[in-house]
């Protein structure tokens, strides 16, 4: 009973002293750690007084004097200070937990590291994984979390063509931009149209490139095919040429008036009996532009799937196919019950990332026809996907930065949500055996 009372008393004492970080550690005879914690606290307090309070105030007000206060800089600086403050709060909680834990160990008669040398050795031994990954976490904070927070805060403001700092101040407007996207007529119609085409584009282009990649891999890996190395090189050509050059070349080939498709390929087909094809409006008719985009992405994307599936096929034991042949299985049955499950099991995560990549595939949409032809409203073209619409919202004659930020967040929620569901449902992350 006395031992339990002593333990509780020591933990309470350490917790109270840890209200000022470092004092609890000093009370536990960990002088070096306590001084380090005090130094960190003092450094944060100094930073908070010199810069932090002003930055957090600026984040809340976004300035008060047009021409002098730069609202965007205040938002960015305040976000950075908010992250620094959150990191210190995590350190503060760790400080209390560490002090109480050490006090409990001492009260229980367990050995506690008190000298600087012992604590450094302990950190190098038990804390090596954390020290090794610390740079990655720091980079993640400033490369991922910081931009995401800035984007979120911009989406909650009225940052647009009429509110560009420092001449005009930015104001907080809450979730108005999100509500406008869903309920304001012009934005709602555009968002629905662009989102619908984005989904169609993602599903069609990605599925076709996956199917073509699997078919070509199966074709080349058949025993009766001779000159497999030549075929493998040929199928890699679309991947070897930079996508930028390929897209621009296709853009010229599909030109309505002087492109190779209308000027040479279609007339060549028209020499066949009973064939009379008119010139196709590849870049002036939205339907044919979308068709061309899907075909081009299929051409660009299938070599990657082909290479990946080829590796999987070569790893499948031949005995499985021999046993299936003895049992009388046809080629379709062997593919359905052996080949396809093996491919899906090994490549499902990569297949999912192909869909997420094409969902945000800005380059082909913009380079081929700049999102045209025609208009879907609110600055979007008839073939714009969400990511290219965001680009136009921020670079047009009347930029809408806050709306673009809101659409960016919606894209993130959609992609992350669908990806998490797909990854969770994928057997590639389970322990199931592929029969």
UniProtKB/Swiss-Prot annotation:
SUPFAM superfamilies: MalF N-terminal region-like, MetI-like. It is a multi-pass membrane protein. Its main location: membrane. The chain crosses the membrane at residues 35-55, 73-93, 136-156, 199-219, 234-254, 293-313, 337-357, 403-423. Residues 195-422 form the ABC transmembrane type-1 domain. GO terms for molecular function: ABC-type maltose transporter activity. It holds the Pfam family BPD_transp_1. Keywords: Cell membrane, Membrane, Polysaccharide transport, Sugar transport, Transmembrane, Transmembrane helix, Transport. It is found in: Cell membrane. GO terms for cellular component: maltose transport complex. CDD domains: TM_PBP2. InterPro entries: MetI-like, MetI-like_sf. PROSITE patterns: ABC_TM1 (PS50928). One of its GO terms (biological process) is maltodextrin transmembrane transport. Part of the ABC transporter complex involved in maltodextrin import. Probably responsible for the translocation of the substrate across the membrane. The complex is composed of two ATP-binding proteins (MsmX), two transmembrane proteins (MdxF and MdxG) and a solute-binding protein (MdxE). Belongs to the binding-protein-dependent transport system permease family. MalFG subfamily. This is Maltodextrin transport system permease protein MdxF. It comes from Bacillus subtilis (strain 168).
